[in-house]
From Swiss-Prot:
Transmembrane segments: none annotated. Its EC number is 3.4.11.9. It comes from Ajellomyces capsulatus (strain H143) (Darling's disease fungus). It catalyses: Release of any N-terminal amino acid, including proline, that is linked to proline, even from a dipeptide or tripeptide. This is Probable Xaa-Pro aminopeptidase PEPP. Keywords: Aminopeptidase, Hydrolase, Manganese, Metal-binding, Metalloprotease, Protease. InterPro entries: Aminopep_P_N, Creatin/AminoP/Spt16_N, Creatinase/aminopeptidase-like, Pept_M24, X-Pro_dipept-like. Binds 2 manganese ions per subunit. Catalyzes the removal of a penultimate prolyl residue from the N-termini of peptides. Belongs to the peptidase M24B family.
């Protein structure tokens, strides 16, 4: 593990700096110089028709301004006085029997980057006190995240609109501490990907490799997964977000081992996510067709990475990936025509239907990307990030090529579009399923910092697979 990451993470999560950043964004948007930011953490939720609680996931905007993972907590930030207060639950004697003593206010003050820690029973009193001192200013909150017992009546004005935008836009550019968390999530996830690659040849089922990935993440400190892992063997990899992860690696219809395993998985470290995809040849060596597609996708990714720097239009990176895909598929004979004609007609969307990447942070598809899912251009419809890249933003770079009959068949059936695809050549590639290669990178002023060290050079992957029986 990187010791420089340990040194950064030895300090407190910079909640106070984040609160200032959100308040500054509120001012920039024209909503005033003062007031109170109010946020609630996620509530403990019970499983329906059961006395057990749901797995807990802290609200991301609350964590951003508090660094606190505790359920049923609250916070206020007095913008004018630059004062951040965390409210944590009081002792519940019944709960102590089962769960032990909770964190005390003094312990929480020592642990989190806040100015004061009170109990949740003090929230309304604290809000009323602010109004009495400040003659009832404005409160900024999220409309669907205010508990029924909380009252804003003493305030002259309640704004339920700007806080969400201000927080989500503030989260786009990461500070040093956040990048250290993302780097550690990538370090651990890389270890898990390597463990999967080494076990791929001997595994019998997708779930075995998923279990190895999760266990490795857990052992190094990622107690949660960033998202439901994707372990897609053979043609299952043609489904972008395959979820089953439970099929045998030997195809029951042919009796032969499937060609590849697409692994899209990342551990979550202290609320921050890794999102990494690799493709592994299950036999230890890529088939000729698999290697051809892999090389195209790797070229798509490497040329995309070379373009990344502050100020670059993400749409340009995405468009370039389509052009690289078109050139590669033309060379293989899968596509027919000219590069310009195929690009203008959107033929590459049949094989590369998703965006080249998205923001990454506390959410896998992190905030601030401003996607346009109503875009009439199919190349951009599922691009989750639009506009220029900011220095300090973290993005995924994840081009792919897929052989999904559900997506490709309508193109083949179209008299206008089908002529651009050679079905005889295409027939050789269906069993490849899909190839996606995904790294996580920090945008810098003159380039990028790739956080992902998992092997992606095909010879390196083959060597790791083949070395383990």
């Amino acid at each position: 593990m990187d010791e420089s990451v340990d040194r950064v993470l030895a300090g407190k999560y910079p909640a106070k700096a984040h609160a200032k950043r959100v308040a500054a964004r509120i001012r920039e948007l024209g909503y005033g110089e003062s007031g109170v930011i109010y946020l609630e953490g996620q509530k403990t939720q019970m499983i329906e028709d059961n006395d057990g609680s749901m797995p807990f996931r802290q609200r991301r905007n609350f964590f951003y301004l508090s660094g606190c993972p505790l359920p049923d907590s609250y916070l206020t930030y007095n913008i004018e006085e630059d004062h951040l207060t965390l409210f944590i639950p009081p002792i519940d004697e019944d709960s102590v029997i089962w769960s032990g003593l909770p964190l005390s206010p003094d312990e929480a003050l020592e642990m989190y980057d806040v100015d004061a820690v009170l109990l949740t029973t003090d929230v309304n009193t604290s809000l009323a006190h602010f109004c009495s001192v400040k003659k009832g200013k404005k409160v900024f909150a999220l409309a669907d995240q205010v508990s029924p017992h909380i009252t804003f009546l003493p305030f002259q004005e309640t704004d339920f609109d700007v806080l969400k935008r201000a927080a989500e836009e503030s989260r786009v550019v990461k500070d040093t501490y956040e990048i250290a968390l993302l780097r550690r999530a990538n370090e651990i996830s890389t270890k898990a990907h390597v463990a999967v690659i080494k076990a791929a040849r001997s595994a019998a089922n997708e779930r075995e490799l998923e279990a190895i990935f999760i266990a490795t993440c857990m052992s190094y400190g990622c107690r949660e997964q960033s998202y439901h892992p994707i372990f897609a063997s053979g043609t299952n990899a043609a489904t972008l977000h395959y979820q089953n992860n439970n099929e045998d690696l030997v195809d029951k219809t042919t009796g032969e081992k499937r060609l590849n395993m697409l692994v899209d998985a990342g551990g979550e470290y202290r609320t921050y996510c890794a999102d990494i995809t690799r493709v592994v040849p299950l036999s230890g060596k890529f088939s000729a067709e698999s290697r051809q597609i892999y090389d195209i996708v790797l070229d798509m990714q490497m040329t995309s990475l070379a373009m990344i720097r502050a100020g670059v239009m993400w749409e340009d990176v995405h468009s370039n990936s389509h052009r690289v895909a078109i050139r590669g598929l033309l060379k293989l004979g899968i596509l027919r025509g000219t590069e310009e004609e195929l690009f203008d007609k959107g033929i590459s969307v049949a094989f590369f239907p998703h965006g080249v990447g998205h923001y990454l942070g506390m959410d896998t598809h992190d905030t601030g990307g401003n996607p346009n899912y109503e875009d009439e251009n199919p190349k951009f419809k599922y691009l989750r990030l639009r506009g220029t890249l900011a220095c300090g933003a973290v993005v995924t770079v994840e081009p792919g090529i897929y052989f999904c009959r559900f997506i490709i068949d309508p193109y083949l059936a179209s008299p206008e579009l089908g002529k651009y695809i050679d079905t005889n050549v295409l027939e050789r590639y269906w069993n490849v399923g899909g190839v996606r290669i995904e790294d996580n990178v920090v945008v810098t002023q003159n380039g990028h910092d790739n956080l992902t060290a998992a092997p992606k050079i095909p010879e390196e992957i083959e060597k790791l697979v083949a070395a383990t029986q």
